A protein has these predicted regions:
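Long, compositionally biased intrinsically disordered regulatory segments in eukaryotic proteins
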Residues: 1-165
């Protein structure tokens, strides 16, 4: 088997036309339609594409739930729908960062459940996350807050402070 040509032609030696585009461009359109909410590329039926997109979002919700189990448990049966609504037009940042962004978004909207607030407070106390780069462990004592939950990190240990009810 020979290596693919490097001069822009396809395996048959034909240059891509504006109608067909290069293979890489067509693949990019398909990926954008599946994971970034882009329009269906030419030649793809919208219904199967929507089904594949929904399956990928459910898989992504499961990955986030593994990293943020209290957030998912706090939302209960609303978890899949809440995640899909939030993630539909956002790129995949990985389970940890997606969960962090979702928890912060719910906190901003005052829709974060108590379990999710406790988990977010603990993460904010133990890690530094600016929303653009990967979270990093904090080395110094820190406090994380979310709604009524307060977490204190000292010497690598986290204590969750709960108010008396």
């Amino acid at each position: 088997m020979s290596a693919p040509p490097v001069d822009g032609t396809d395996l048959t030696g034909e240059l891509p036309t504006p109608a067909t585009g290069s293979l890489a461009a067509r693949q990019a359109e398909l990926v954008a339609a599946l994971v970034a909410g882009g329009p269906p590329p030419p030649g793809f039926a919208p219904a199967p594409l929507a089904a594949a997109r929904a399956a990928l979002l459910r898989k992504r919700a499961g990955e986030v739930a593994r990293h943020w189990p209290l957030l998912a448990a706090g939302l209960g049966p609303r978890w899949p729908a809440a995640f899909v609504e939030w993630a539909a037009d956002r790129p995949n940042l990985g389970g940890l960062r997606d969960g962090w962004e979702l928890a912060r978004a719910l906190h901003t909207r005052h829709a974060l459940p108590a379990l999710g607030a406790e988990e977010l407070a603990a993460r904010e106390a133990t890690h530094r996350y600016d929303g653009t780069t990967a979270p990093r462990h904090r080395r110094w004592p820190a406090i994380g807050r979310a709604d009524r939950a307060v977490a204190v990190q000292l010497a690598g240990r986290v204590r969750l402070l709960r108010s008396a009810r």
